[in-house]
Structure formats: structure tokens, C-alpha cells
UniProtKB/Swiss-Prot annotation:
One of its GO terms (cellular component) is cytoplasm. This is tRNA 5-methylaminomethyl-2-thiouridine biosynthesis bifunctional protein MnmC. One of its GO terms (molecular function) is tRNA (5-methylaminomethyl-2-thiouridylate)(34)-methyltransferase activity. Residues 1-253 are annotated as: tRNA (mnm(5)s(2)U34)-methyltransferase. GO terms for biological process: methylation; tRNA wobble base modification. It is found in: Cytoplasm. The lineage of its organism: Bacteria, Pseudomonadati, Pseudomonadota, Gammaproteobacteria, Legionellales. Residues 283-666 are annotated as: FAD-dependent cmnm(5)s(2)U34 oxidoreductase. The keyword Cytoplasm applies. Catalyzes the last two steps in the biosynthesis of 5-methylaminomethyl-2-thiouridine (mnm(5)s(2)U) at the wobble position (U34) in tRNA. Catalyzes the FAD-dependent demodification of cmnm(5)s(2)U34 to nm(5)s(2)U34, followed by the transfer of a methyl group from S-adenosyl-L-methionine to nm(5)s(2)U34, to form mnm(5)s(2)U34.
């Protein structure tokens, strides 16, 4: 199901005596005497954070999670970040989660943060990575993933509710291995912003908390005290900041019942399974395998990759100029949301990599309006792109020719932050880590579980991740996964003096890349159901014919220098398959009653194989979707709070096909 995207309404700021005032809530962001000192007193000291940080374990797998109800100027985050670096163990990681219904525009944010030069180092990094203010989740990483920020844009209750597995407080606590350690309840006054202090929100906060979780807020309102108490928190008295008489501190003590109307059957998640060691075995050394290996290694895991070929970055990941591009739409569906979230995150990841490695360019790409259907689709984006010009701009024939550097027959959609990346080189960079071992020349034909670890080719690990593309359903445990093979062939031609003027990737019925080493890569064929990467001259000619239609005024060389074919793996709904792998027979038995009512509450998590995960079926958009999917999966394996909303976890879950079959019947 899809519905129109509702754009974010940014904060309407009025500056009074050099202080930011919210016209939406008729309240001030911070007072003249407040700011850093108030944040330090209320949130840092109110949650006893410095003492708690100093007692944390000194390993990378340890994550301390802080959640905030109103991001505002970001000052609480920046101060927390600075103090974390000073007092927390060097290898520990901070995950900061926040939300804002009306976020500040970047220029307003810059002006607000100029008031605190002592936070300038952190401020500069936040401004650099400040996201396009589209609705939903934005995940930002700083300091090589030591500090992460999940910034949710939208209604606070809706955003935090999506972090729940099921919404039943008893089952939620059975399933949850990751909790918020400390809460910053920071929003405008309860009398002016009631939704941020509602009973329903505090019920969700309780479900995301454990007995050691603390809460702090500047408010001393009886409404807040009552709501926290009803949710299972014990209130502690504390003097307020400055002239304020009181503030509220609290700690979570016990679970209360949750509203039955808000429960969701947790068919997408499994019960916790003990992991004796932080060891992982990954089958497949393509982009998916290398990204998940990198994400786990950063968390202190020892990782082994088993690759069938003689090196990583082969097969479907062997494209030396893979194109990064989004799938923009004015409609909100799991597919369009996942594609947008993924593109924004991937773009941030690749920008950071390009600071250190010469493995591509992000100078933009052009999606040509090459037929009436594509033209109509692009025209439907006009209003969306007016609100978010950073995502793309519609250009006419003259503009498209100027942007690309060559004569083009039509206009199109210019994506300014996209471009191309060398996938094999990227794979090499990702696994350049002392915690990652690579074993090549090994085709895995069976997997075994010995009641403690997974065993593949006499190698044992507590966790097994199948990231082997089209071969992911070759095993007994995975043969229910509906993965289809799609063969694609790229053609490499000699560049000419005229064609070397091309500056950015062009996409239409096919696509062509700017010259690299005196040659252009042109592609790509699309053969559904073909699982062998055989090369053929017919596909070369097909690619050359498409190239002529993309830019007919250019004299392209017909001299084929090389060609390459790879097999893409895709699912029926073209979303990837990522997450814990269900036992098909047990799943059908437990959830059989969904056939008569797909929304029926069943108080059971998915029956999954212990510590067995799938990470495959990324299709032709792997460069775009793999970074976010693997970062989420690594967090799940490492017992961290999700960086994706529940609806998107369900959208990519390996269990979704079994559930659909139960509901729809054979």
C-alpha cells in the first residue's frame, strides 16, 4: 500500500534578542541563562552519565544508548558527544536517538550553534552531515562509527513506536536485547506541546527501557510526573536549574500493561539466542558480505569471509563503475521509503570514503526523460523537488547537455549527489581490517549447526550470515526464499575526443559512464532467469544500440575493448532479503491463524534458526541499499536498538514471503 509523502514542515524561527523563538509552539528554544549549563545540569548530571560512562566495559561491542524526545538545536547531542569523548572508554560507542517534528533548517541550526564555540568541533561535523529534511529516519555516523545519531523526523509518538518489536510490554521485554540507557525528555512546555508528554508516549518509553534506565527532564509538571509513574518509573526529587524550583529525574522499575489495540504480531523478529563468542562467518565476498564484515569488525567482532572466487568483489559486485542513484517517488510505500533512506545514508558513507580513497566520483548523474512514461514520472516529482532540491532538479534539454558536457536529445532529472563507485576496489577497502579474515576459492554447499556454533568447511562461528547472492537459497534451510537470478552484461568501448567530454553518468533505457582510463562502460542487459554469466556479442550490440539512443549526436566508438557479465539476485518485490532466517515449517504452524485475519495478534516471535541471517537479493541497486541494510543487520546481531523503523524491517524480512503465502494461500 502507498500514500502520498507528507513533507516535513521545518521550524518557523523568530529571533528575539538574539535568541531563537518557535512560532509553532510559542516558546523559546533556550533561555539566555540556559544553554550548555542547563543541559549539563538537567540531562548529564540528572542521568548521572559521567559516572556511568566511566564504569563501562572497554570493548567496541559495548553501546550506550541515549534517546531524546526533541532534537531542537542539537546542543544536547553535541554536548553529550563532547563529554562522551572525554569520559567514556576509548573503544565504547555512543548511539544517540532523537526526534523532531519541525526540525531547524541548516542555516537556522548554524546560527543557533554559533552561540557555543566550545562545541565547534562537534558542530562542524554535525553541520557537514546534517541530512536532507525528508520525513522518517536518518542515520548519521561520526568518528568512524564511534558516535552515531539516529534522527527521526516526524511525530514523536509515531517515530518511537516504530522502534518497538510488537507493542506488548511483556513480550517486548522478552524479545528485547537492546534498551535505551538514558532518556532526555526535552520538548517545549507540556502546556504548549502536549503530544510530547502524552501517556501513550511514556508507555512506549517504558517498553524501550530496562531497570537501569534513567530519565531526566527540566519539567516538574504534575502531568509529567503522573505519566511517568503510570508507565512504571519511580520519580526522584531534584532541584531545578537556576531559578527553577524543581526538575524531574526518574528510573524505570517495573512493567505495566500496554494497550491491546497497539499490539503487532512480531513475525519479523526472533527470540534472543545466546552468543558465547563474538565470531561471525560470512558466505559471500561481494558488496553485501564485505559491508557486513566491515560493520561487525568495527563493533569488535572477529569475522571470516568465505568467497567462491579468488578474490572479493567478483560476481555481481565486479562493476568498476557502479552507479549510485535513488528511486524517487511522491508516494510513500515500504519500497520508496527504503530506497530514500538507503540513498541518503549511502551517499554519506561514500562521501566519507572518497575523502581518503580515489574510488569514484559523486558529481551527480542524469536520468533522462527518454520516453513519455519516464517524462510523466519525472513531472510528478515537481512539488517534491521544490521542497527538496538537494534530492534532484528537473532540467530541460539545454540544461541536461550543459550538465553532462555532451549534446543530449532531451531533458531529465539531475541527481546532484549521486555518481559512481568502483565496487571491487570498495570491497578491498572494506575488508582491510585486522579482524577480518578472507578464505577464497571455496564454494559452500552445506551449512551445519552443532547446537552451539555454525560450522562451514570445518570453520566454526557463533553467527552465520549468508550473503551469497543468487545462491542464497541453495541450502535446505533457505530453499523457501524466492530469489531470482537476473543476468546483466556491461560493454567497454574506446573513448573518443568527443565522448570524453561526458562528465557524469547518463541513465535511460541503458546507461553510460564517463571515460575512465580512455574507455566508457555501457550497459546493461537485463535477462531475468538467467543464472550463468556467459558473455555474448548480441548483448554488446544491444548496449551499443541503446547508447546511440541516449546521445545520438555523439560519435561513439564501436570498438569493443572488453565486456563483463554478472548475476544480480532479486526478490519478487525488488526489496532485499535481510534479517534472521525463519524455519519455514515451524513458521507456518505458529502463524497459521493469520490466514483468517492478517492482523490477528499472535503472542509469538518468529521461529528462526539460531544466529543464522540472510543478507541478499539487492538487485541492481546494491550500491545504494547495501550500506544501510548491513549497518542495521550488524546492529541487530550486536544487540543494538534498531536504526530502521519496524515497518521497513518487516519489508526486508526473510519471513515476509512465508507470511504472505499463509495469508493469500497456495
Amino acid at each position: 500500500m502507498s500514500s502520498p509523502f507528507v513533507p516535513i514542515i521545518t521550524a518557523d524561527i523568530d529571533w528575539r534578542d538574539d535568541l531563537p523563538y518557535s512560532l509553532q509552539f510559542d516558546d523559546i528554544y533556550y533561555s539566555a541563562e540556559g544553554g550548555i549549563n542547563q543541559s549539563l545540569y538537567v540531562f548529564i548530571e540528572g542521568n548521572n552519565l559521567i559516572n556511568r560512562w566511566q564504569q563501562l566495559p572497554t570493548n567496541e561491542s559495548n553501546v550506550f544508548t541515549i534517546a531524546e524526545t526533541g532534537f531542537g538545536t542539537g546542543m544536547n547531542f553535541l554536548l553529550t558527544w563532547k563529554l562522551w569523548e572525554k569520559f567514556a572508554p576509548q573503544n565504547a560507542r555512543l548511539h544517540y536517538i532523537s526526534c523532531d517534528k519541525h526540525p531547524l533548517k541548516k542555516n537556522d541550526l548554524i546560527k543557533c550553534l554559533q552561540k557555543w564555540p566550545e562545541l565547534s568541533v562537534q558542530t562542524e561535523k554535525l553541520i557537514e552531515h546534517y541530512p536532507v529534511l525528508t520525513p522518517g529516519y536518518h542515520h548519521l555516523a561520526f568518528n568512524n562509527n564511534q558516535i552515531t545519531l539516529t534522527l527521526m523526523l516526524g511525530d514523536v509518538l509515531e517515530c518511537y513506536e516504530q522502534l518497538l518489536f510488537c507493542g506488548d510490554i511483556n513480550l517486548e521485554h522478552q524479545l528485547r536485547e537492546s534498551y535505551v540507557n538514558a532518556w532526555y525528555l526535552d520538548g517545549f512546555s507540556p502546556s504548549k506541546n502536549q503530544s510530547m508528554w502524552s501517556d501513550n508516549l511514556f508507555t512506549v518509553i517504558a517498553m524501550l527501557s530496562k531497570e537501569s534506565t534513567t530519565v531526566a527532564t527540566y519539567s516538574a509538571s504534575s502531568i509529567v510526573k503522573t505519566a511517568l509513574t503510570n508507565a512504571g518509573f519511580v520519580i526522584e526529587k531534584r532541584k531545578g536549574f537556576g531559578p527553577k524550583r524543581h526538575m524531574i529525574c526518574a528510573h524505570y522499575e517495573k512493567a505495566y500493561s500496554s494497550p491491546k489495540k497497539n499490539r503487532h504480531t512480531p513475525w519479523h523478529i526472533n527470540y534472543p539466542v545466546t552468543k558465547d563468542e563474538r565470531t561471525a562467518l560470512i558466505v559471500g565476498g561481494g558488496l553485501a558480505g564485505c559491508f557486513i564484515a566491515n560493520s561487525l569488525a568495527k563493533r569488535g567482532w572477529e569475522v571470516t569471509i568465505l568467497e567462491e572466487k579468488e578474490k572479493v568483489g567478483c560476481g555481481g559486485s565486479a562493476n568498476q563503475q557502479a552507479v549510485l542513484f535513488p528511486k524517487l517517488s511522491t508516494y510513500k510505500s515500504p519500497f520508496t521509503q527504503f530506497m530514500l533512506y538507503s540513498f541518503l545514508y549511502a551517499n554519506d558513507v561514500y562521501k566519507e570514503l572518497l575523502k581518503h580513497y580515489d574510488l569514484g566520483e559523486l558529481k551527480g548523474s542524469l536520468l533522462l526523460a527518454h520516453n513519455e512514461r519516464e517524462k510523466a514520472n519525472q513531472q510528478s516529482l515537481i512539488h517534491w523537488l521544490e521542497l527538496y532540491p538537494e534530492l534532484g532538479q528537473l532540467v530541460d534539454e539545454k540544461q541536461s547537455s550543459e550538465l553532462s558536457g555532451i549534446s543530449l536529445p532531451c531533458g531529465g532529472l539531475f541527481i546532484p549527489s549521486s555518481g559512481w563507485i568502483n565496487s571491487p576496489e570498495l570491497c578491498d577497502i572494506l575488508i582491510d581490517n585486522k579482524r577480518i579474515s578472507l578464505i577464497t576459492g571455496n564454494r559452500v554447499q552445506s551449512i551445519n549447526y552443532n547446537q552451539k556454533n555454525w560450522v562451514v568447511k570445518d570453520i566454526e562461528a557463533s553467527v552465520l550470515i549468508l550473503a551469497n547472492g543468487q545462491q542464497v537459497n541453495y541450502f535446505h534451510e533457505t530453499n523457501h526464499l524466492p530469489v531470482k537470478a537476473i543476468r546483466g552484461q556491461m560493454t567497454t568501448i574506446q573513448s573518443t575526443q568527443e565522448s570524453t567530454q561526458l562528465k557524469i553518468p547518463l541513465c535511460a533505457e541503458g546507461h553510460v559512464l564517463p571515460a575512465l582510463n580512455n574507455s566508457h562502460r555501457v550497459g546493461a542487459s537485463y535477462d531475468i532467469g538467467t543464472s550463468e554469466p556467459e558473455l555474448n556479442a548480441l548483448d554488446d550490440q544491444l548496449n551499443l544500440d541503446r547508447l546511440k539512443r541516449i546521445a545520438p549526436d555523439i560519435m561513439w566508438s564501436q570498438n569493443v575493448l572488453d565486456h563483463w557479465a554478472g548475476i544480480r539476485a532479486a526478490s519478487p518485490d525488488y526489496l532485499p532479503i535481510v534479517g534472521p532466517l525463519p524455519n519455514a515449517l515451524e513458521f507456518k504452524e505458529i502463524y497459521s491463524e493469520l490466514k483468517s485475519n492478517s492482523k490477528r495478534w499472535i503472542a509469538e516471535a518468529a521461529p528462526c534458526y539460531p544466529n543464522l541471517y540472510v543478507c541478499a537479493a539487492f538487485g541492481s541497486r546494491g550500491l545504494t541499499t547495501i550500506p544501510l541494510a548491513t549497518e542495521w543487520l550488524a546492529g541487530l546481531i550486536n544487540k543494538e536498538i534498531s536504526i530502521l523503523p519496524r515497518k521497513l524491517i518487516q519489508a526486508i524480512s526473510p519471513s515476509r514471503f512465508l507470511r504472505k503465502k499463509i495469508i493469500q494461500g497456495p
